[in-house]
Amino acid sequence: VPLPDAGIVTHIHFDHLDGLGNAYRLFDHLPVYAADETDPATDESVAGTVARKYDYLSRVEVRPRTPLEPFEICGLEATLVPVEHPPLVCYGLAIEDPETGAKLSLSGDTAYAVPDRSRAVLADPDLFLADAIVPASLCEHHPLGGAHHDPDGVPRTFGTKHMTREGALDLADDLSATETRLVHSAHFYPASEAFEEPIAVDGETYDL
């Protein structure tokens, strides 16, 4: 897989951030974009946390950006949008090609209750990559159960932080996504369901 021209950090959980510590082995220079709004839980922004943690890596250049305001990255238009991943601030992402109009939306790590303003930015993607950590049936094993139930009582959020498979598919419908792939899937999917469509698998590529 070719190395990226830039990076975007959506939140500061280790599985979305700590790999930057190896950037010096791979890059001469890596611009990293992240939100500039202060998180009440940490008293600093995502961009601020990235800059503080990796201030010793001159090859990482942090570029703060304001949520819900489009910015240019690698010739594309990107917009960070607030989502629901308590207790920390977290962001989804919409990326559009200004020449073709092709659009990719990423839910980011989130519960089903994505704010309306963020949904408006994410809406109508050609491809939607949606957080779908487990099937809704596994919510009974979470200490907090499930949340954001659909009219049939199916939980669309696992605990408080991630969407269930069913929640991710409902959000895709809400956004009128042309194609949806489910990502951030845990290893707790039953073997009989682990490779069912539309769960993404390593190595997939997409043309928009």
Positions of the model-derived regions?
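Binuclear metal-dependent hydrolase catalytic cores
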Residues: 1-107, 111-120, 178, 191-208
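Cap/insert and terminal regions of metallo-dependent hydrolase folds
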Residues: 114-207
